[in-house]
Amino acid sequence: MKIYVVAYLAKNLGDDLFINILTTRYPEHKFYAISKGEKGYDTKNFKVYSNVYMFKALKKFQWEKHLANHYDAVVTIGGSMFMERGDTNRDFSLGKNKRYVLGINFGPYKTQEYYNNIHNMLSNVEDVCFRDKYSYNLFKDLPNVRQAADIVFSMDMSNIKNTNRKRAIISIISPKDKINKKYKKQYEEKMLELISFLIVKGYEICLMSFCKIEHDEEEIEEIYSKIPENQKKKVEKYYYNGNIEEALNTIADSQLVVGGRFHANIIGLCLGKSILPVLYSDKTLHVLQDMQIDTPIIDIRNLESFDIKSITDDDLTRHYDVEKQKEDAQRHFEKLDLQLKKT
């Protein structure tokens, strides 16, 4: 079958994992998508038409739904795919074919109108599977709505080389891109304090970018430039460039993951690492609450209330059993499996 994919194609590690999981699960089917211009996604069964002008025209004039009618099914796969951003009156439908909306959370949103638009759209698709109970509870009146653990938990990481190196992977985000530039100074100060704190405890540090387009790399350079010279020898940088296996092996070569990116925390958990989440929105919090994970949380929106020195050695070495989540995450695909006749 030919499947049209709606996803965030921007060389973002978390979203690239979604695509990898989807296309690997159904190797006998062909997947197609259109990106704003990002290249390097094509595989045996995934073709991306990379054209910024075509992408903008499809979105602006709502031609995408007509294009989608030429495919056997439509799969929307991602995390934060439905955020209001002021677009309260869009037509969210996408053609007449069966549409599957997988792995998402809802929000943030501000108006009832936006919620109603999404509620109406989701009521007309074949299957919706949220990754958190908060989002599910907003739409649970719909018979086609389900909830399962984040899709990345379903990924086979058996080929990844896991170590116990005393190293902390710190996933850095750009506050001005992800939340608000007013938090930038405080965020950088807190990350510098955390880096020093971990180095004193004997950790090596790797500052990791998940997405260049969202300015992770720029923020890393700014933070790195402010690290004292006597500490820089303990700090390295890793910039994700589309090589998923390399990125996962980088994270696996550690004991601790400081997760600014949502999926830094999920990958850390999958690989059996201790995690220290850094929040810029509630989406990570909702998932951690669903999993009943008890760990210190650094909230960028409330940095002044978090004391780095309150982090204990137990916090830095706590591990979590996520076998249940790894199995549960497979359920995102149970309806699509039927459509694509996977047994």
What does each of the following model-derived ranges do?
Residues M1-T343:
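Active-site anion-handling motifs in enzyme catalytic cores
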